């Protein structure tokens, strides 16, 4: 129930329960030049639940005041499984009192987890393959819905072509594109920009946070 919790949840069997991270005991819960939600490690746990509603989640962030963000979270090496149905995703933000500031998310690692009967396998950084079949000078690559907490596409760590990039007359292009971050109505897409309309395949690694 504190933001800068300095806690590790490691090696547990978590049966029909969830982790809720809140600041409900803060008498001034709005963000005010502090660390915000930080220093939480959730690793190597077995999460199991049965016959739950599709909106059930195992990891819930619940800010009780406006302006907060995540400033250090590691979720790695966990098993997530549902019996007797499926759930939409394993994590969510409870906005009963306030939402979070997605533009300030920082130092979030969410990887090497395993999912069964979960619609969306969350990961950060997200490695995505994009195939552009028709020539365009702007390729739109979405990070939704796999970025944690429905986060913004805020950083690109790497971008590489898988095979040749070709223009409308089938000539190979060797240029390096540039990207526009946090695009679209939900800020969850990347625009990959070229000097001319081209087609091809790329692999892109994107994040919903600012890494250290």
Model-derived features: where do they sit?
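Extracellular parallel beta-helix/beta-solenoid repeat domains
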Residues: 1-211
């Amino acid at each position: 129930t504190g933001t800068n919790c300095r806690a590790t949840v490691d090696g547990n069997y978590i049966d029909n329960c969830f982790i809720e991270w809140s600041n409900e005991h803060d008498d001034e819960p709005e963000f005010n030049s502090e660390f915000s939600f930080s220093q939480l490690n959730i690793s190597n746990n077995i999460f199991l639940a049965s016959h739950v509603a599709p909106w059930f989640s195992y990891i819930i962030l619940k800010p009780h005041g406006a302006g907060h963000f995540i400033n250090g979270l590691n979720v790695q090496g966990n098993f997530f499984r549902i019996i007797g149905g499926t759930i939409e995703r394993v994590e969510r933000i409870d906005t009963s009192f306030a939402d979070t500031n997605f533009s300030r998310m920082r130092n979030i690692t969410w990887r090497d987890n395993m999912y069964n009967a979960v619609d969306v396998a969350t990961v950060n950084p997200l490695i995505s393959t994009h195939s552009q079949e028709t020539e365009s000078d702007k390729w739109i690559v979405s990070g939704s819905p796999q970025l944690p907490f429905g986060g913004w596409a805020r950083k690109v760590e790497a971008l590489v072509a898988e095979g040749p990039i070709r223009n409308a007359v089938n000539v190979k292009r060797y240029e390096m594109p540039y990207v526009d971050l946090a695009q679209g109505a939900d800020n969850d897409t990347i625009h990959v920009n070229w000097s001319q309309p081209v087609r091809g395949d790329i692999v892109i690694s994107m994040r919903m946070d600012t890494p250290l």
